[in-house]
Amino acid sequence: MLDIDKIPADQPVLIAGPTASGKSELALRIAEHSGGVIVNADASQVYDCWRVVTARPSAEDESRAAHALYGHLSYDTLYSAGHWLRDVTPLLKGTKRPIIVGGTGLYFLTLTEGMADIPATPPEVRAEADTLSLETLAADLDPETRARIDMQNRARVQRAWEVLRATGRPLAEWQDDTPPPLLPAKDCTALVVEAERDWLETRIRRRFSMMIAQGALEEARAMQDRYDPALPSCKAIGVPELMAHLSGALTLEQAEERASVATRQYAKRQRTWFRARMKSWQRVSPQA
């Protein structure tokens, strides 16, 4: 059981966890108890167009504590872990203790273990990668890189392929040359929310129905004329499914079910990743 009274008020807090696990609620409790600014570490929550679909903090939540890096980007902005690290850096030096929370493990990894200085991907290399299947991209990667990334996440696999294609060096080699981290985990209260699978899956099944009731369909309808499935912002779970419903390809019930399945699959990958890459972090229950 986590005793938030024992968390040093002047020490940064990191909270990682799978989707729908209650990590944002925990961050808000800590902020209200001992102060701080809640900083987003979830790649889908950086876009201004998706508050409901991506479960960004509500306006009420934002009124209870300071929040940063939520919904601060236009839907068509390309945003990487490197961009996030740049944006979070000044918050580490601010007057309020950062409480960094999210489900994008790569963000936490770059923060606590450092980030390789990899050259930007040339547009022609990215254009070539966009035409290739996930299987084709994966087949070109070296074993060490394959072992380090989520091989079911196209964005991660494509990024690794682009690095190899553009530089001639595997992503794993670049990572091995990484400079010191901005914020080592040992200097933080580093927490991973570990939710029991059945409990989490029940929450996930309820969650999308709640999103529909809260306006997720209206959110998707407002973006329908700008929807581009190639954009990272439009790949957030729930967005393709709702767009398919709006186009007549799926019933709303089918869209809800597909989104729930995709969310459960994503949560499973997140749990696996956190277990493998955050072994030294303190485990806490959602009810902590």
Swiss-Prot record:
Swiss-Prot/TrEMBL cofactor(s): Mg(2+)
Organism: Ruegeria sp. (strain TM1040)
Gene3D superfamilies: 1.10.20.140, P-loop containing nucleotide triphosphate hydrolases
Role summary: Catalyzes the transfer of a dimethylallyl group onto the adenine at position 37 in tRNAs that read codons beginning with uridine, leading to the formation of N6-(dimethylallyl)adenosine (i(6)A).
KW Transit peptide (keyword) present: no
Residues the record lists as binding substrate: 19-24
Domain of life of the source: Bacteria
Binding-site residues, ATP: 17-24
Subunit structure as annotated in this protein's UniProt entry: Monomer.
Keywords: ATP-binding, Magnesium, Nucleotide-binding, Transferase, tRNA processing
Keyword presence, tRNA processing: yes
Molecular function terms, GO-annotated: ATP binding; tRNA dimethylallyltransferase activity
Catalytic activity: adenosine(37) in tRNA + dimethylallyl diphosphate = N(6)-dimethylallyladenosine(37) in tRNA + diphosphate
Site features described as Interaction with substrate tRNA, chain residue numbers: 104, 126
Species lineage: Bacteria, Pseudomonadati, Pseudomonadota, Alphaproteobacteria, Rhodobacterales
Family that this chain belongs to: Belongs to the IPP transferase family.
GO biological process, one term: tRNA modification
InterPro entries: Dimethylallyltransferase, IPT, P-loop_NTPase
Gene name as annotated: miaA
Enzyme class: transferase
EC number in record: 2.5.1.75
Protein name: tRNA dimethylallyltransferase
